[in-house]
């Protein structure tokens, strides 16, 4: 009887794996949170190309650990913000989109991610000119309305990926016809 009580948990461990989040076979996650804090970026509105965007991720990796192995697209994504919006003329953030186009960033990862948390804010604050928010941010097609308030702030958007993936497509959009999505991103955490 004592042997069977010991063997049941051991067999469950061997059959199921030690931890679903460990990123091993069947786990689908990295097992570790990889955080990128863009507060150390120093430019104000310089367009990223794939190389400079990748460098920004490497330099922004908290504790030096990076799961990002490359950037395959950086379209209308900026190191810092030039004029306009809630954080105009500000370094230490990544701006997505512009008045005439959405922003898009495609990351390749060393292993599959299953959760992404983006600390961000809408391009505008709530004012008479902009009484409602229509800017969205998506990760791998999962679109969420951006945090929006009367004063500039920050909020987390959490994306639990439908399928673990080693590619992340982050892009803005707008629900109003003939408008384009814009936002400010302060940090990204990939798990």
Specify the residue positions occupied by each region the protein language model found:
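Bacterial Sec-dependent N-terminal signal peptides
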Residues: 3-8, 14-40
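Intrinsically disordered, low-complexity repeat segments enriched in small/polar residues
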Residues: 5-6, 11, 72, 175
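N-terminal start and proteolytic maturation junction detector
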Residues: 12, 59, 75, 79-83, ...
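Terminal, low-complexity interaction segments
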Residues: 36, 40-54, 58-65, 78, ...
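Short beta-strands within extracellular/lumenal beta-sheet-rich domains
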Residues: 83-115, 121-123, 154-158, 181-187
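Extracellular ligand-binding interfaces
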Residues: 98, 109-111, 117-148
């Amino acid at each position: 009887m004592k042997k069977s009580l010991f063997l049941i948990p051991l067999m469950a461990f061997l059959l199921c794996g030690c931890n679903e989040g460990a990123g091993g076979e069947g786990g689908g996650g990295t097992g570790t949170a990889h955080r990128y804090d863009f507060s150390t970026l120093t430019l104000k509105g310089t367009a990223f190309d794939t190389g400079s965007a990748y460098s920004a991720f490497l330099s922004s990796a908290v504790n030096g650990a990076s799961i990002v192995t490359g950037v395959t697209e950086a379209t209308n994504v900026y190191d810092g913000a030039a004029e306009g919006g809630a954080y105009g003329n500000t370094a230490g953030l990544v701006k997505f989109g512009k008045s005439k186009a959405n922003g898009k960033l495609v990351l390749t990862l060393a292993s599959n991610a299953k959760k992404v948390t983006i600390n961000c804010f809408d391009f505008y604050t709530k004012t008479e000119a902009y009484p409602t928010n229509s800017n969205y941010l998506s990760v791998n097609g999962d679109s969420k309305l951006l945090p929006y308030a009367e004063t500039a702030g920050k909020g987390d958007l959490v994306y639990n990926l439908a399928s673990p993936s080693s590619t992340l497509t982050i892009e803005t959009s707008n629900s109003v016809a003939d408008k384009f999505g814009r936002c400010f991103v302060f940090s990204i955490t990939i798990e």
